Amino acid sequence: MKTTLLAVIGMSPAVITETLYGLHGRGDVWPDNIKVITTAVGAQKLIQQLINANPLHQLCHELGKPDISFTAADILVVPGSDGVPVADARSTEDHEALANFIVTTVRDVTRNNSERIHASIAGGRKTMTFYLGYAMSLFGRRFDSMSHVLVSEGYENHPEFFFPTRSPQLLQLRDGRTLDASDATITLADIPFIRQRHLVPQLLKEFRETVNFRELVELINLGEDPAAIRLSVYTQSRQVKITSVYEPQLAVTVQISNPWHWALYVLLAEESIRDEADRGSYGRPQSSKADEALAAEMALKLAELNGLELLGDSVSALLTELIEQDDLWTNHPNLERSLVAVKEKGGITGDQFSTYINTLQTELAAKLPANLVLVIAPGQTFDEQGELLAVTGRIKNRGGFYGIPLPDASQQIRFVVD
């Protein structure tokens, strides 16, 4: 497995060589390559002090380690809000862009599971180190690591000090004193971090769109405060929009692809806003018998959502009418397969029901944090009396009935006919 040293750097390129020295000193894996996130000014410092002067080669030689190729292509310059590389992030907009860039970079380098990351938060502005640390918490894997480097007094930030040399090397201080580089000590402090990669929406982990750091954090925070969620169900366009009572600008929309699955979602959302005494209609069908009543309700709901009137007096007849509606399923080939499968079974089986629920959860998880999905995706929500279960969502409760497990669904869910 290859190792990449990923660091944020400000005006002190020596952080790179100091970190490498520290890794060697404690017997850690020697990196194969280096990636540095910095500003335009920091990039010039790196080119002058690490690439042109090349103390990196000297370090590798003294430690008996393989040379690490480091070129200008390995320097990732943070763009401002206008997309132009920044000399220094000063505005609020530039800091937002900086956060997005750092988090996106970490997302990208952690996509390859055959490459481990060692992140250094020893350099750069405080905000840069925070964003790198938090990005590692969001995207870091069990084999990734993070550190800060501690350099003995007097040597830190000295322009001519890069690592403790084997031979004496005198360094002149501003007050006229001298220090010997060979006397310096470097300590690499391991930084433990909570790994929250499981919370991140699946699409953000897989694709190269820029990560909106603020939105991602707000969505994760919203998942920790279910009472603040507001869920708009757009019945015709098969969309749910998630907003927050505390963050008016936050709004994320997810579309459900299969109209048959969407019909079930709408039924369960409607179930969730009913009075307690009227809830508890939708349980997982028994494995021994297909559920005709549920199939009929879903068929009628699908027809209603698409402006159709069904005349059949049996599940088979209702499903046949839907299958014959070419306009309904032409753009949704999975819909025809779903309808035919239910017709062949004479209703909805327990396995089919579980597939519908799992597919809905997966589609929501593609764009939303896992903790948020737990409270807006269908799950076991009610007991036989229609009361909210103490533990809802994906945890299996014997005899539990399905709904949308928001704490006060009647106040949190609204339906929009679009």
Q: What is each stretch, according to the model?
A:
Residues 1-117, 130-418:
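Long, low-complexity, Lys/Arg-enriched
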